[in-house]
Amino acid sequence: MSPDNPVPVTPAAKPTERYQSFTGAASVRYPAPDVARGFMLLLIALANAPFWLVLFRDRAEVTGADTIWTGLRAALVDHRSYPLFAMLFGFGLAIMARRRIEAAMRSAEADLPPGTDPAARERHLDRAREAAVVDARRLVRRRGLWMILFGAVHGIIFAGDIIGTYGVIATIFAGTIVERKRTRMLVVGIVMTLVCAWSMSYMGWAAGGGPEAAGLTASEATAFSPVVRTAPGPSLPFDNLIGWLFSTFFALTSAMTIPAAFLGVRLADSDLMSRPDRHRRALLVGGAAALVVGAAGSVLNTRLTGGAPIYTLIGGAPAPQSFLTGPALPVWLASLTPVIDILTGLVGACGWLALLAAWAGPG
C-alpha cells in the first residue's frame, strides 16, 4: 500500500485503547457515538417536518412562536442534521471495516505455526491482508445495497427518505472508505462541494426572482427542480417513490452528504470520538465556535426563504412573511445565500458533533 492509501492494519494487532469504543469484550464502551446518533435522529425528524409543506397549497398564518422556532431551526437544524448524519455514517463504516480487517489479520497470524520463515510469514500475511480488504469492501457495499432497498420501501411512504442516500454513498465508495483513499476522498469531496454549491445557487436564483429577471415562466423555472410535488390520492405511493428517487439525487448533490461522510471516515483515524475526554477543552471551545458560525451562515438564507424549504419556493411561490424576512434580496445575493448556508451548515454539524462528544465522553 502506498502512503497515500494506507489500510490501517497491523498484523497480530490487538484492539488498542484507541479502537475500543464500541464492542470489545473487556473494554469500556464510550457513549459519544451513540449519544450523537440519537441526537442526530432528533435533528433529522425536526429537519424533515417542513417537507410535508409540499402536500399543501395553502399555508397557515405564521405566528410569533412559529417565527422564533423557524429562526432556531434554520440556525441549528436545517442543513446541519444531514451532514451530522453523514459524518457519523462515514465514521461507522470506517470503524466496521477496520475491525473486520483486524479480525482477519489476527486469524491469519494465529494460523501460522511457530517458527515460520519470516519471508513466508510476510507472504502469508500479505495475502491475508488483501483478502481481508476485499471482504471488508464487500461488507460495506452489501450494507449499502440493503440500505438502498430499505430506503426505497420507506420512500413509498415518505419521499424525503434519507436512508437510500447513505446507501448509495456506501455502495459507490466502499473501496474508497475501506482502503482510506485519502487523495480520492479529497478530490471527490471538493468536486461534490462545488456541485452542491452550484445546485443550491440555482435554487437560490430560482427562488429569488432569477427566472422572472431572465424572462422564464414558472413551468420553465421548475423544469430543473429536484423535487416532485405530490398530493394525496390513489397514486401517492407511486408518486412518493418517484419523488424519493429525485430527493435521493437531491441529497447527494446539494446537502454536502458525500464530503461529510468522508470527514467521518477521516475522523475514525483519530481518537476524538473514542476518547473525547483527552480533547474536552478543544471540543467544547471549537464546537461552540462552529455552532456560532453555522448559525450566522443561516441568517441571509432565512431572510430569503422565511424558513420554508427552498425547493418549495421555486416557481414563484411566496416565502412565509415574518420579521425574519425583509425586502427582496438582489438576484446575485439570493443565489449566494443558500451556498453560504450549506457550507456553514457543515461547520455547524461539526460543532454539534464536537459538543455531543465532549458531553457524552468519559472523563
Model-derived regions, located:
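Long hydrophobic alpha-helical segments that form multi-pass transmembrane helix bundles
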Residues: 190-269
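Structural signal for the C-terminal ends of transmembrane alpha-helices
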Residues: 93-101, 175-181, 265-275, 356-363
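Membrane-interface interhelical connector segments
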Residues: 60-62, 303-335
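Short aromatic-rich membrane-water interface segments that cap or initiate transmembrane helices
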Residues: 67-81, 238-251, 326-344
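N-terminal signal-anchor module of multipass membrane proteins
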Residues: 2-98
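Membrane helical hairpin/interfacial module
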Residues: 58-163
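Alpha-helical transmembrane segments and their helix-start/interface "positive-inside/aromatic belt" motifs
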Residues: 25-42, 179-193, 277-290
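Alpha-helical transmembrane segments of multi-pass integral membrane proteins
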Residues: 257, 321-363
